[in-house]
């Protein structure tokens, strides 16, 4: 990944890089790979994430009009 530094503004370029990495899920992936996760634990975590996603989607879904 590349971020160009314009006008010697390194801080701005660093913030831009961090934002890009955040949107790609880089930091989340690093946290997941820090320690080994057993397949059973991984399966359970994925199920919980999917359930959480379903609940969140249901909360923000527009009610059907009959």
Curated annotation (Swiss-Prot):
Residues 34-46 have a biased composition (Basic residues). Gene3D superfamilies: Ribosomal protein S8. GO terms for cellular component: ribonucleoprotein complex; ribosome. GO terms for biological process: translation. InterPro entries: Ribosomal_bS21 (IPR001911), Ribosomal_bS21_sf (IPR038380). Pfam families: Ribosomal_S21 (PF01165). Keywords: Ribonucleoprotein, Ribosomal protein. Residues 34-66 are annotated as: Disordered. Signal peptide: none annotated. One of its GO terms (molecular function) is structural constituent of ribosome. It comes from the Bacteria. Belongs to the bacterial ribosomal protein bS21 family. This is Small ribosomal subunit protein bS21A. It comes from Geobacter sulfurreducens (strain ATCC 51573 / DSM 12127 / PCA). The gene is rpsU1.
